[in-house]
């Protein structure tokens, strides 16, 4: 391989609202039987296509899969979203995953996703501490979003496989990544694979990850694993020392401190970032237990609507409960149960 205690609440104003705040490509191996044709060649590249140096990537630790606020008419509420992002970074998160599943990315249009990304930049947030979801069913959309991420300065692009067709050959998934890598060679951005087969229906399986690393070198930086299969996550983390794997649960944080993982990317870190930070930075077992207890409140419930319902409660901001179709508002009984459970955890003092 070539070298190639819960946060103190205060008030924050944003947009008039008051918040309560508590190429790099390796030469292809011709002997590999599943290789796909290269989409570009050196002779066809212009000076503007000349590969640039990949920025240093330091994403690690507690990363919240940050929610995206939705406005009254179904549009992304960027002001409210960036206020939450700032709050999470100030109260424990090492980084953020913008426009992932919790951020309802695939329910927004290409233009809406680009506008949210731009809003993060215009808010002066540290994009070098953030990866942003750029995967799409259409490769042209994935390219456009990944280019925008690179232009704005995000630390990484989190790439879902193209999720409509099921049972596709590995060659098709390699071609998808090839198109993104080739189109962003002049201004590269680190690529993180997003493994969520329950939603996408497709797997970034270990043999395929090895192939992508062999083909595209250091452009492929890591993996977010939302499969819940810790054996798979450990296998993926063992491929290369530099390949960063982030399971989607806080329960993996002890293994991020001294084991195979680079951290976690969690939806419930929207709600328990301070506890996760203690668990990760100082090995605080009590804080980890409280963080996991909060996560388990959502077992058997609709996670994204539930996260947003609890954000509405925590920040005393009812608009946070809005979700984008096809999701629907969290059921009232579930909301009451989750709020009661969360408040009970927060009533305890974590040493």
Residue spans of the language-model regions?
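Low-complexity, intrinsically disordered or signal/transmembrane-proximal segments
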Residues: 12-13, 19, 30-35
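Serine residues within intrinsically disordered or low-complexity segments
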Residues: 10, 31-32, 44-48
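Catalytic alpha/beta core domains of metabolic enzymes, predominantly
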Residues: 183-187, 196-302
